[in-house]
Curated annotation (Swiss-Prot):
Keywords: Calcium, Glycoprotein, Lyase, Metal-binding, Signal. It is an enzyme of class 4 (lyase). This is Pectate lyase. SUPFAM superfamilies: Pectin lyase-like. Glycans are attached at residues 134, 227. Pathway: Glycan metabolism; pectin degradation; 2-dehydro-3-deoxy-D-gluconate from pectin: step 2/5. It comes from the Eukaryota. Belongs to the polysaccharide lyase 1 family. Its EC number is 4.2.2.2.
Length: 397
């Protein structure tokens, strides 16, 4: 009898262990094993990264990257036609007369510049960083943090590329005198604590940025900003992630066109991934693994095309829906006219997407500069290397 009981006990122990293993496998973090640090040979998994990442000579030909943008921001060349400017000083003590060698000194120059960094840096901006036209901020090769101070402001500018930075813990900073360009000092009000703020600007490409914990938005684009691509970025730990269009009265935002491609919207995000007004927004092959209220929201007739994305809903039954329409400004009859399309998206853990408007629009917009979506089953691979990269000179990135 004792032997029989031992055998029964062992049997049930094995059953429990097997069940625990299966449960653990089912509840592996949402990015699963793909989020572990990769140590193998270079793998460029999406169309943008394939353009430059696995070239071991990327550091000798940095400006090749300017040919790699896709989507609505594909014409952004940044400082491709200019010289290299090296940031050697991480200070930001004088915002009216910034020192040569600082990041602030580089971004206000009249000439096109490809701005790189001479070492690992943690930069605390005393005031918002005003980036003028024809500039690239290229953090490849070093770990560059913009942290614990103001964020980046792109205002009335064009041809901007921002790549491979870690932007986090951004806070509002007070108003006052600030050099806005090489030959102009302006009196500015306080800022809101955005990570990157785009105001009345065009031809912008933001790529491979790791962002978390700003005060207002991580990335906001307003005041008729257009022709923007945000790609290969990793977002975590924030409430209101992206705002495209500041209010429901600024109708000039109808010309806004923004591409989101190959981004990972990760842990502890709440809403606005993005929140859109008026314009045309193409969301392609992004990985939405967390949202607490909603993922994609909008109003004022925004057109939203979601293609080949992966949406993994939270377990909470009340937040399975991906989309949110601002019902205070529109009746059901009105928002049902807004064209929101889900095409080839992967809906997991009960996620739902409520479509509306012209579901045949994709057949009518071949002339637009849209990234061709890959199957949503590949999203985990396409976004595997999202966020700032750890690039080493002389090796594939």
């Amino acid at each position: 009898m004792d032997v029989y009981r031992i055998r029964i006990s062992v049997f049930f122990l094995l059953v429990l262990l097997t069940f625990a293993a299966l449960t653990t496998a089912t509840n592996i973090p949402r990015r699963q094993l793909s989020n572990k640090k990769y140590k193998g040979p270079c793998r460029a998994e999406n169309a943008i990264d394939k353009c430059w990442r696995c070239d071991p000579n990327w550091a000798e030909n940095r400006q090749k990257m300017a040919d790699c943008a896709l989507g609505f921001g594909s014409n952004a060349i940044g400082g491709k036609l200019g010289r290299i400017y090296v940031v050697t000083d991480n200070s930001d003590d004088d915002v009216v007369d910034p020192k040569p060698g600082t990041l602030r000194y580089g971004v206000i120059q009249k000439e096109p510049l490809w701005i790189i960094f001479g070492k690992n840096m943690k930069i605390k901006l005393s005031r918002e960083l005003i980036v003028t036209s024809n500039k690239t901020i290229d953090g490849r090769g070093f770990n560059v943090h913009i942290q614990n101070g103001a964020g980046i402001k792109i205002q009335s500018a064009s041809n901007i590329i921002i790549s491979n930075l870690r932007i986090h813990n951004i806070v509002p900073t007070p108003g006052g005198l600030l050099r806005e360009s090489e030959d102009h000092v302006g009196l500015r009000g306080s800022d809101e604590g955005d990570g990157i703020s785009i105001f009345s600007s065009h031809d912008i490409w933001i790529d491979h940025i790791s962002m978390s914990r700003a005060t207002d938005g991580l990335i906001d684009a307003v005041a008729a900003s257009t022709n923007i691509t945000i790609s290969n970025c990793h977002f975590t730990d924030h409430e209101k992630v992206m705002l495209f269009g500041a209010n429901d009265h600024y109708v000039l935002d109808k010309d806004m066109k923004i591409t989101l491609a190959y981004n990972h919207f990760g842990k502890r995000l709440d809403q606005r991934m993005p929140r859109c007004r008026f314009g045309f927004f193409h969301l392609v092959n992004n990985d939405y693994t967390h949202w607490e209220r909603y993922a994609i929201g909008g109003s004022s007739g925004a057109t939203i095309i979601s293609q080949g994305n992966r949406f993994i809903a939270e377990d909470e039954l009340l937040v399975k829906e991906v989309t949110y329409r601002e019902k205070l400004t529109a009746s059901v009859a009105e928002w049902m006219k807004w064209t929101w399309i889900s095409d080839g998206d992967d809906m997991e853990n009960g996620a739902t997407f409520t479509p509306s408007g012209d579901q045949n629009l994709l057949d009518k917009i071949d002339h637009l500069n849209l990234i061709k979506p890959e199957p949503s089953s590949k999203v985990g691979i396409l976004t595997k290397f999202s966020g700032a990269l750890s690039c080493v000179k002389g090796r594939p990135c």
